[in-house]
Amino acid sequence: SVIEVIETRIGGISDLRSQVAPKQVDRLVEIACHRFHAVMQSKPVHDILNGKITEWYLFSRLHKTKLGKYKLHISPDLVWFSGKTCHLLRFTVQGVSKPGDDKHLENVAMVEWAMQQKGLPANYERYIVENLYWNNGRWKLWRKRCTERDLEDSKHMINSDMRAMID
């Protein structure tokens, strides 16, 4: 079982053994492997692995970005270039079938992060914002070119949300 493999690697008894049935752990790992193999076949990951996308970078969402008086986690997971266009992608392990405006604007905030980074375009028009999300048994890709209105609406939403949390 997966728990036995974990225990061999850690050299002791895993806390999982008392919390989750071994068959349930095995099933969760099977699901994770299915998702992993599926994402390897999805765009843009497949294009990176096949060399169609040659200029790409990974970033940590743990990096904070200053937006006004707030420090936020708004960086993308993956950035790549296609000509002069810069793509900003975030992975969502469990997404909804039709992301609402709030999720769209949350993703647009990645452009704020990008425009503060050395080596990335300073012009919002050069960005395509993307989200690769898992829904109904497959990976789906949402994408949209950034507009000035999107960027302003994103900043407004973030400021409203932050004020609501502080009040």
Residue locations for each model-derived region?
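Catalytic cores of nuclease domains that cleave nucleic-acid phosphodiester backbones
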Residues: 5-90
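Generic detection of long, well-ordered alpha-helical segments
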Residues: 22, 26-33, 101-105, 148-155
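Accessory terminal regions of nucleic-acid processing enzymes
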Residues: 3-7, 11, 152, 156-167
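Hydrophobic, Leu/Ile/Phe/Ala-enriched alpha-helical segments that form helix-helix packing faces
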Residues: 32, 36-44, 111-119, 162-166
